[in-house]
Amino acid sequence: MESSLGSDLARLVRIWRALIDYRLKPLKLTQTHWITLHNIYQLPPDQSQIQLAKAIGIEQPSLVRTLDQLESKGLIVRNICSNDRRAKRITLTELAKPVINQVNQVINVTRNEVFYGLRVEEIQQLNNIIAKLERNIINLYNKT
């Protein structure tokens, strides 16, 4: 019996991302913007683009376009690193902090609505299963 779990999970991620994009539209932001801002906010100050790309789990060229957009919105600044002129350090602007709070509010409301009807134990169990699947996949990558 073939499982459609992989396809189901991929579809779930797509529609969840689309819902977040829709709800962030009034703020003129996307889910990709949120993930990037959230990671910049969570990481130690003045991360390089390379470090940020690794933290998010994407390639640096993919990140550059998003950073360009966030910079044009006045939410981040990129400065050349004094130790390595090829590297750029990313810093949130003062304008970003209230925007991050607004975005987090939208994300939290959306998450609560998505999880409506699920018990806390079910959500914890789902998180545990996802973590196990992720570990298995990472282990498979490490074997090759």
Swiss-Prot record:
- Residue ranges of every copy of the HTH marR-type domain listed in the record: 2-135
Entry keyword annotation includes Transcription regulation:
yes
Alphabetized SMART domains for the sequence: HTH_MARR
A molecular function GO annotation: DNA binding
Query: Which PROSITE patterns does the entry link to?
Result: HTH_MARR_1, HTH_MARR_2
Q: Which InterPro entries does the record cross-reference, listed alphabetically?
A: HTH_MarR-typ, MarR/SlyA-like, Tscrpt_reg_MarR-type_CS, Tscrpt_reg_SlyA, WH-like_DNA-bd_sf, WH_DNA-bd_sf
Q: Does the keyword Transcription apply?
A: yes
Which key words tag this protein in UniProt?
Activator, DNA-binding, Repressor, Transcription, Transcription regulation
Q: Which GO terms describe its biological process?
A: response to stress
Q: Where is the signal peptide?
A: none
Residue ranges: DNA binding: 49-72
Pfam families linked: MarR
What is the recorded function of this protein according to its Swiss-Prot or TrEMBL entry? Transcription regulator that can specifically activate or repress expression of target genes.
Q: Which family does it belong to?
A: Belongs to the SlyA family.
Known PANTHER family for this protein? TRANSCRIPTIONAL REGULATOR SLYA, TRANSCRIPTIONAL REGULATOR, MARR FAMILY
Tell me how this protein assembles: Homodimer.
Identify this protein by name: Transcriptional regulator SlyA
Provenance organism: Blochmanniella floridana
Its gene name is slyA
